[in-house]
Amino acid sequence: MDAFIRFTNQTQGRDRLFRATQYTCMLLRYLLEPKADNEKVVMKLKKLESSVSTGRKWFRLGNVVHALQATQQSVRATDLVPRICLTLASLNRVIYFICDTVLFVRSTGLASGVNKEKWRRWAARYYYYSLLLSLVRDLYEVSLQMKQVAHDRAKREKSPSQDTLGYSVADEETEWLQSLLLLLFHSLKRHPPLFLDTVKNFCDILNPLDQLGIYKSNPGIIGLGGLVSSVAGIITVAYPQMKLKTQ
């Protein structure tokens, strides 16, 4: 309960709850739309989704500052690959939030001359770049974890006193995929923050992929991905130790 109270008291926490609500509405709307007798429910879900989306804009007005702070932190990373990926990802996120703020100002009627479609496409593009770079960082961290697990497994296999049932070497020719997936599973299992960050970024990237026409998805897939991503974000805000740290 204390963790939940701390969570709701944070701006990021409230934004994650609003985001989860928004994508839940999108997913439910997609599931209910084919049925003709659900028109009223679908309309209510659509209005709630729109209202929650607008409410989230107020929580995100300070995100440009947060993204700049994240850029400063990523520059100090000791490992070269995370430093480059996170710095560029944060810079792209700054541009994305600027575009998002311009779109929000336009929606209030203060800048009606702004080309909505152009700015929306710019926002989607820089959001995509940010997530893509974050995923590259995640994959790099996963590869390091897999190397460590493989090293530990090799040490276990050399020791006759250790139980190697879960770490048997798969036949290189016939079971290489099974061995790789098992190695990936153990790597993510021993590093939950990396698992959450990878899942979150993968689910998030579905939206800009659809908006940019790179990979088209339906609202149900985007809604489900957004909901899963929001739950992962809620966990990292409520339990900071589950957030992937910059080395």
Curated annotation (Swiss-Prot):
It is a multi-pass membrane protein. Residues 106-219 are lumenal. InterPro entries: PEX11. Belongs to the peroxin-11 family. Coiled coil: none annotated. Its main location: membrane. GO terms for cellular component: peroxisomal membrane. The keyword Transmembrane helix applies. This is Peroxisomal membrane protein 11A. Homodimer. Heterodimer with PEX11G. Probably interacts with COPB2 and COPA. Interacts with PEX19. Interacts with FIS1. The keyword Transmembrane applies. The chain crosses the membrane at residues 84-105, 220-239. May be involved in peroxisomal proliferation and may regulate peroxisomes division. May mediate binding of coatomer proteins to the peroxisomal membrane. Promotes membrane protrusion and elongation on the peroxisomal surface. It comes from the Eukaryota. Residues 220-239 are annotated as: Required for homodimerization, interaction with PEX11G, and peroxisomal localization. It comes from Bos taurus. Keywords: Membrane, Peroxisome, Peroxisome biogenesis, Transmembrane, Transmembrane helix. Residues 1-83, 240-247 are cytoplasmic. One of its GO terms (biological process) is peroxisome fission. It is found in: Peroxisome membrane.
